[in-house]
């Protein structure tokens, strides 16, 4: 009989408990995944009790309060606090989202916070985005043209052509969608994932780009594109309300047209 063995230090253990101090009018417990790869120790779940009446309304506000007032070693990324930069992407209450726009009041019970799933962890809630960014670079996410740039002018397009980019250019590369996708979990080394494919379609759909055929050929691969099985987790979890699954479908349709299907 085959014996199943977990990787070393993969079992998550109970960590420290930080009790609230003083008078508390609105107590909530926040459970945070803690892991430092420089230490030869298992990850833990640390618990923090905070008074929500003394913090802001978003999960990120609670994290900042914990870091500033309780445990300065808690590590996470954040920047804009407006849902624009994508830095604070993490798994909150079982769903990938942005901590800065996730209201605490929408979560019942203890607030459980983990890093984005199926990515290596740099520390605590900080995932290693290196592979994700390398995949983004591979699609050449810039305007590719054969004609010289106009002098003292922009490359113009019609209002109708510009509208084709709506729902695409707004992607902030937070990776919430890709890390919610089982196909990306299983084949992340080869499958580009919903975020990168949506970005690829953004340039394919741009009327100013002259290399549509080249871009489609680069994606016509059993793994890069066709590992998408329309599970739809990507569309469900996108904090910007975008539809990566639709973009992937559009790419597949354009490739089929090229083959006369």
Swiss-Prot record:
Binding-site residues, a ubiquinone: 186
Cofactor: [2Fe-2S] cluster; [3Fe-4S] cluster; [4Fe-4S] cluster
Keyword 4Fe-4S: yes
Residues reported in the UniProt entry to bind [4Fe-4S] cluster: 171, 174, 177, 238
Alphabetized UniProt keyword annotations: 2Fe-2S, 3Fe-4S, 4Fe-4S, Electron transport, Iron, Iron-sulfur, Metal-binding, Oxidoreductase, Transport, Tricarboxylic acid cycle
Organism, as annotated: Rickettsia bellii (strain RML369-C)
Segments forming domain 2Fe-2S ferredoxin-type: 28-119
Reactions performed catalytically: a quinone + succinate = fumarate + a quinol
A Pfam family per the record: Fer4_17
Subunit structure: Part of an enzyme complex containing four subunits: a flavoprotein, an iron-sulfur, cytochrome b-556, and a hydrophobic anchor protein.
Enzyme class, broadest EC rank: oxidoreductase
Molecular function (Gene Ontology), one example: electron transfer activity
Listed GO biological process terms: respiratory electron transport chain; tricarboxylic acid cycle
Disulfide bonding pattern of the chain: none
Domain 4Fe-4S ferredoxin-type: 161-191
Co-factor: note: Binds 1 [2Fe-2S] cluster.
Chain residues that bind [3Fe-4S] cluster: 181, 228, 234
Chain sites annotated for binding [2Fe-2S] cluster: 80, 85, 100
Involved pathway(s): Carbohydrate metabolism; tricarboxylic acid cycle; fumarate from succinate (bacterial route): step 1/1
SUPFAM superfamilies documented for this protein: 2Fe-2S ferredoxin-like, alpha-helical ferredoxin
Presence of keyword Metal-binding: yes
InterPro entries linked: 2Fe-2S_ferredoxin-like_sf (IPR036010), 2Fe-2S_ferredoxin-type (IPR001041), 2Fe2S_fd_BS (IPR006058), 4Fe4S_Fe-S-bd (IPR017896), 4Fe4S_Fe_S_CS (IPR017900), Beta-grasp_dom_sf (IPR012675), Helical_ferredxn (IPR009051), SDH/FRD_Iron-Sulfur (IPR050573)
Protein name, per record: Succinate dehydrogenase iron-sulfur subunit
Domain of life: Bacteria
């Amino acid at each position: 009989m085959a014996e199943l063995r977990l990787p070393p230090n993969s079992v998550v253990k109970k960590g420290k408990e930080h009790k609230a101090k003083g008078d508390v009018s609105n107590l909530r417990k926040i459970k945070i995944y803690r892991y430092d790869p420089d230490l030869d120790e298992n990850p833990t779940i640390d618990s923090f009790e905070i008074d929500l009446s003394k913090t802001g309304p978003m999960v990120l506000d609670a994290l900042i309060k914990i870091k500033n007032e309780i445990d300065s070693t808690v590590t996470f990324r954040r920047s804009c606090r407006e849902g624009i930069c994508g830095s604070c992407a993490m798994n909150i209450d079982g769903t990938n989202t942005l901590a800065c726009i996730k209201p605490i009041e929408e979560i019942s019970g203890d607030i459980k916070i983990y890093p984005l799933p199926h990515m290596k962890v740099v520390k605590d809630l900080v995932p290693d985005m290196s592979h994700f960014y390398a995949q983004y670079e591979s699609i050449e996410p810039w305007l590719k043209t054969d004609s010289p740039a106009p002098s003292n002018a922009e490359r113009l397009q019609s209002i109708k052509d510009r509208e084709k980019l709506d729902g695409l250019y707004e992607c902030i590369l937070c990776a919430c969608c890709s890390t919610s996708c089982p196909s990306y979990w299983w084949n992340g080394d080869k499958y580009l994932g919903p975020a990168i494919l949506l970005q690829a379609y953004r340039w394919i759909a741009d009327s100013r780009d002259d290399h549509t055929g080249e871009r489609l050929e680069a994606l016509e691969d059993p793994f890069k594109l066709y590992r998408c099985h329309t599970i739809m987790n990507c569309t469900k979890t996108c904090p910007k309300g975008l539809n990566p699954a639709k973009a992937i479908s559009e790419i597949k349709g354009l490739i089929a047209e090229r083959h006369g299907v």
